[in-house]
Structure formats: C-alpha cells, structure tokens
C-alpha cells in the first residue's frame, strides 16, 4: 500500500462563467521514503496539488488516501491531526509568527500535541542546534536573515517528527548560498527517512529529488524517477498525550499567547476595556449605594425596635371607628406576655395636653407605657433613670422626658428631680432620653413617658389602651407569632377588631423595595456593559481579520478548531476580566471618596457584588467573544494562509 495515493483529483476555483479548472484528473502515488519534486510554471496547479496533499485544501472531486484512509471523509479536526502528527511544512515565505522567538516558533506544533513545556523547549533547542542556530534561540524572526528563518521553519516542520515534509518553493525567497544550504538540509532529511514532497519551478532544485513530476495546465505531463527509493526509517516524533496535563498545557499556552496579543496593542486593548470598566464600575457603585441606603434604613428600623409587633384597635391606620373601640386592655397585654414565643408585652396609652413648668406652658404628648417599652423600642437614656416595675405597680407620679422638653424647659438647669405639670397633674422628672437621630425620630414634638398605670388612673381615666407593643423572642418566627396573637385576641374579643404592624414586615418591604430599585438602576447601568461587550466583539473581529495569516499558520502546524476557538475566546475573556477588575477598583476608589464626604449613608461594596461583577465580565467576554472566535476557528487553512 502506498503512503499517498491520489485518483482522478480535480480542483475548481470560482463558479458559473468564472469557474476555472485548476487540477484535471490527477492520479499519482507516493511511497514512504520517497523524495518527490513537483515542477511546473506559475499557474500550472503544482501548489494547489501540494495544498491538497498536505490537507490544507480539499479536492473538488476524486480520491485522496493516506495509508489507505480516505481524507474526504475526515472531519476538520481529523485533518488537523494528520497535519499535526505526520506532516511538516516548509513555506517559501517561512510563515513564522513575528511575536514569538525562534525557540517558541519551533516548539509551537508540540503545544498542540500536548507536550510539556520543558520537553518542548529541549526538543526545539536540539533541532535549532542541529541546524546551526544554537545562538539564535531567543531571537524573533525580524532579527534573523532569510536563510536563518527558513532553517527555523525546517526545525518547526520536524518538531513533531515530520514523517512527511511538504516544501513549497523552499529556496524561492533565498539567495543562492542560503538556497544551497537549505537544499542540503532537505536532502539530509530524506536520507534520514523522511518522505519529502517539494514544489518548485526551478529544474536545478528539482534535480535534488529522486522523482520529478511535471505539471502543466493542471495535468501531469511527465513522472520520472532517477534513483531507487531509500527505505524509510522510524522517524521519531512526539506522541499526543491524552491526560489532564495535555489540556492544562494547551490552556496555559493559549493564555500566554492571549496575553501577548493584548499587550501587542496596548492602547486598543485599553480603549476596548473602557466600556467594560465603566459598565462594571457603574453596576458595582449602584449596588453599593443600594446596599448602603438599605443598611441605613434597616438600622433606623432596628432603632425603633426589632422583632416587634404592635397591636392597634380598628381595621387599619386611618380607620375612623378605631377611637370608639375600647376592647384592647391591660389584661390582653398580660395574657400576651405569657405566650411561649413572647419576650415581653407592654401596653401603651397616650394623651395630649398642656405641659407646665413655672410660667411656661407647652403642648406635649404623654405616653403611658410599661417598664420594658424603652428596651423594646431601642430608646437610650442620656441621664437619670427609667421607671421600673414597682413604679408601674404603684402608679408612681414619675416621668421621663425627651431632649425637646429638656431644651424648652431646662435649657440652663438640671431637670432631674424637678416637678412638672401635665394637664395639671404633677409628675417628677427622673430621666432624660437621648435625642433619636434615626430617620423616623427627628421630630419637634415634645414627648414624655410615664407608667401606663399612672396615665390611665390619674390622667385619662380610661381602662383600655391605645396599643400593645409585643417583643418576640429571637428564636421565634414573627410571622408565626403574628398568627398566634391574632388567633388569641380574636378568641378573647370574639371578633377581629384590631390590626397588627409587624416590624419584620416593614423590614421585608424595605428590602424588597430597595432590591427592586437596585435591580432597576443596575439594569440601566448594564446597558453600558452591553455596549462594552459589543466593542469587545468588534475589536475581536478586527483582530481575527488582522491575524488571519497567524490562524492559517497555526492550522497548518496542527491546531484544532477548538484550539483556535479557545485562544480567541480567552483573549476576549481576558480583556473583559481585566476591565471588570479595573471597574471594581474604580468603584472602590469612588466609594472611599463618597464615604469620606457623605455621612448620611455609606457606599457598601459587598463581596457578592465583586464576585458578580467578575462573573458578569467573564460572561460578557464569552458571549461577545464567541462569534469572532468561532469565525476564526472555521477559517479554511489555505484561505487563511493566503492572507497577507
């Protein structure tokens, strides 16, 4: 069985009236160890034939077999495997990647074989040394002469073994001396057992081969052999490794090359990132503002009591009949306090009236409450003491005043121990409350607190309360507790002539409302992210167009479609992730400045918003980078190589 066998190969370019028949029923076979020169004038079809033999192009019709396997039935990645594992290409224009050193250019085919970094470098250095380039390993193509670049190209062709060497006009761009040197290397490769297929238009170059096939106008006009074939030796090559390190090495290499591509166009990369930076900074800042305002509001709610349920007469706030409902009593509060889920229950009654001290009369509100009311509501004492259980039991004529009362009546004196009159009833001041700075407590209303027994028995003369404030135990569910209290009072009153205000419900409403606002504003900020993503896609499409030649080179040396897709996708994600991290940093800087100058509420950047921002930027990189990356992966190798 021949190594290579072609039967009736035809190739056409164009369509319709512009259709050109390039190859016409080409049939040939090539044995292992053969050195074949395909000669012909420009436009004869010789390069097209070599591209088909090297699986860079496909025939329009006919059969092409490698070791008896029909290539027409192979998938793109199977053809890539042939180029990677068995073929080596020597191009007229060298086709080296300008951003890589000689060593990295030579080692590149082994990347797609899964060879480790040390193994790749050692083999590349050995090949360069064998070709007289030991001192040029770190040089880039622009720092090498034409002959040196071609020797690097030859070393690359041998990196994975190069069982079959395809040489396309290998001396076409070289001077005479360099051309002779390259041909000597190719002859040695043939003598070492490599099968060599060379395309040339020069009869003197073709004379180095032991078999010459001449093509004219797409047809073979002669096929002559002058020397017997040399038996093929076992050409060594790196074997593909299907292990986790295989995928890891490929990812690391793709990442490294993506970093090089980003750094190669620093300003363009920065401008591309700008949309992502602004978008991420906007989203993180908006969420931070939402978190800060929500935190401030919830702190204010907590300051007036957490885990509390307030019970009022009537059907709801604004119920005009509530003033006539007198069923909420002290006994209700006592029964409620005995429930297993209740920490405390304090009744409250209130009265408005004239507050008198010496010759000053003021309008104030007096609240009759239990001794636990202050703790439940989170009110703090500034000076003096609060009334206790004994004061409540004894109807003590004591009062705790707020800062407004102190400022109005005792601006220049100590109020403790002083007697004031409320509705002409004497009350002794025993304490002063701190000014309540939360959002719900900034008021000019003059407020006083006395034991509810004192207010009910000595001032209002009523037996019912205006409300009952219930403190729920920390381990109890407030929703369950609310239902239990409702059932209890309905059973006692015989009807539901009351309503409840659950502080946790307020908290949930605030959280829901601020969450909705954050989502709404974030969705607006996300528009800039989408715009940034479109910018990334645009630049990646430009990058694919600019690097089409590079893509063709990588495909020629064995890169799978997945390798090309991965590299360009990593590049897009890298741009977006860097942009995302810079955006988070920018938001953090804005937060520091904001929190320094604004004290009402902070910008609170949470770990989740940072994680979400990075995840979002990664998702944008994948979403908007996939189309350009997929376009690159689907390029035809020969079409990509033809781009300048």
Swiss-Prot record:
GO terms assigned for molecular function: ATP binding; ATP hydrolysis activity; transmembrane transporter activity
Subunit structure: Homodimer.
SMART domains for the chain: AAA
PANTHER family tied to this protein: MACROLIDE EXPORT ATP-BINDING_PERMEASE PROTEIN MACB (PTHR30572:SF14), MEMBRANE COMPONENT OF TRANSPORTER-RELATED (PTHR30572)
Gene3D superfamilies noted in UniProt: P-loop containing nucleotide triphosphate hydrolases
GO cellular component assignments: plasma membrane
Any one of the GO BP annotations: response to antibiotic
Domain ABC transporter: 4-242
Topological category with respect to the lipid bilayer: Multi-pass membrane protein
Residues that, per the record, bind ATP: 40-47
Protein's UniProt name: Macrolide export ATP-binding/permease protein MacB
EC numbers, comma separated: 7.6.2.-
Gene source species: Neisseria meningitidis serogroup B (strain ATCC BAA-335 / MC58)
Pfam families named in the record: ABC_tran (PF00005), FtsX (PF02687), MacB_PCD (PF12704)
UniProtKB keywords: Antibiotic resistance, ATP-binding, Cell inner membrane, Cell membrane, Membrane, Nucleotide-binding, Translocase, Transmembrane, Transmembrane helix, Transport
Location of the protein in the cell: Cell inner membrane
Segments crossing the lipid bilayer: 270-290, 524-544, 574-594, 607-627
Known function: Non-canonical ABC transporter that contains transmembrane domains (TMD), which form a pore in the inner membrane, and an ATP-binding domain (NBD), which is responsible for energy generation. Confers resistance against macrolides.
Annotated family: Belongs to the ABC transporter superfamily. Macrolide exporter (TC 3.A.1.122) family.
């Amino acid at each position: 069985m021949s190594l290579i066998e072609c039967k009736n190969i035809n190739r056409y370019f164009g369509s319709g009236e512009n259709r050109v028949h390039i190859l016409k029923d080409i049939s040939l076979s090539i044995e292992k160890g053969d050195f074949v020169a395909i000669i012909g004038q420009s436009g004869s079809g010789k390069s097209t034939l070599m591209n088909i033999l090297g699986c860079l192009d496909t025939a329009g019709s006919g059969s092409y077999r490698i070791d008896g396997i029909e290539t027409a039935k192979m998938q793109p990645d199977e053809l890539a495997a042939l180029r990677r594992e068995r073929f080596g290409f020597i191009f007229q224009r060298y086709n080296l990647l300008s951003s890589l050193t000689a060593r990295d250019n030579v080692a590149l085919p082994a990347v797609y074989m899964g060879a480790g970094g040390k193994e790749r470098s050692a083999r590349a250095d050995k090949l360069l040394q064998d070709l007289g380039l030991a001192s040029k390993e770190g040089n880039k193509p622009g720092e090498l002469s034409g002959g040196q670049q071609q020797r690097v190209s030859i070393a690359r062709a041998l990196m994975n073994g190069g069982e079959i060497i395809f040489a396309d006009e290998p001396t076409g761009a070289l001077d005479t001396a360099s051309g002779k040197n390259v041909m000597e290397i190719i002859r040695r490769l043939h003598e070492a057992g490599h099968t060599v297929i060379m395309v040339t238009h020069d009869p003197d170059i073709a004379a180095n081969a032991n078999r010459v096939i001449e093509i004219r106008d797409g047809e073979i006009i002669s096929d002559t052999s002058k020397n017997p074939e040399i038996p093929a030796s076992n050409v060594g090559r790196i074997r593909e490794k299907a292990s986790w390190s295989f995928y890891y090495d490929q990812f690391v290499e793709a990442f490294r090359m993506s970093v090089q591509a980003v750094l190669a166009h620093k300003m363009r990369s920065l401008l591309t990132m700008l949309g992502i930076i602004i978008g991420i900074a906007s989203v993180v800042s908006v969420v931070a503002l939402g978190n800060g305002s929500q935190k401030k509001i919830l702190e204010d709610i907590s300051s007036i009591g957490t885990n509390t349920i307030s019970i009022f007469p009537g059907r709801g706030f604004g119920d005009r009949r509530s003033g006539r409902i007198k069923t909420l009593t002290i006994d209700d509060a006592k029964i409620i306090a005995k429930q297993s889920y209740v920490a405390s229950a304090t009744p409250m009654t209130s009265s408005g009236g004239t507050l008198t001290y010496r010759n000053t009369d003021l309008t104030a509100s007096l609240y009759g409450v239990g001794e636990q009311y202050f703790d439940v509501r989170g009110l703090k004492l500034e000076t003096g003491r609060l009334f206790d259980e004994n004061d409540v039991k004894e109807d003590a004529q004591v009062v705790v005043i707020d800062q407004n009362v102190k400022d109005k009546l005792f601006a220049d004196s100590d109020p403790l121990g002083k007697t004031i009159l409320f509705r002409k009833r004497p009350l002794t001041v025993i304490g002063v409350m701190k000014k309540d700075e939360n959002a719900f407590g900034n008021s000019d209303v003059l407020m006083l607190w006395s034991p509810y027994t004192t207010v009910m028995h000595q001032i209002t003369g009523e037996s019912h309360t205006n409300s009952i404030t219930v403190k729920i135990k920390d381990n109890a569910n407030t929703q369950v507790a609310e239902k239990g209290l409702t059932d209890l009072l309905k059973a006692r009153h015989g009807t539901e002539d009351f309503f409840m205000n659950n502080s946790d419900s307020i908290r949930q409403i605030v959280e829901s409302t601020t969450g909705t606002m954050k989502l709404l504003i974030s969705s607006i900020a996300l528009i800039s992210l989408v715009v940034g993503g479109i910018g990334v896609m645009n630049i990646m499409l430009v990058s694919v167009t600019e690097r089409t030649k590079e893509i063709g080179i990588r495909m020629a040396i064995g890169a799978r479609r997945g390798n090309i897709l991965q590299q360009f996708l990593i590049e897009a994600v890298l741009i977006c992730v860097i942009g995302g991290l810079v955006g988070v940093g920018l938001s953090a800087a804005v937060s520091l400045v904001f929190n320094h100058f604004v004290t009402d509420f902070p910008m609170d950047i949470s770990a989740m918003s940072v994680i979400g921002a990075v995840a979002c930027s990664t998702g944008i990189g994948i979403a908007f980078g996939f189309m350009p990356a997929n376009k690159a992966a689907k390029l035809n190798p020969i079409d990509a190589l033809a781009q300048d």
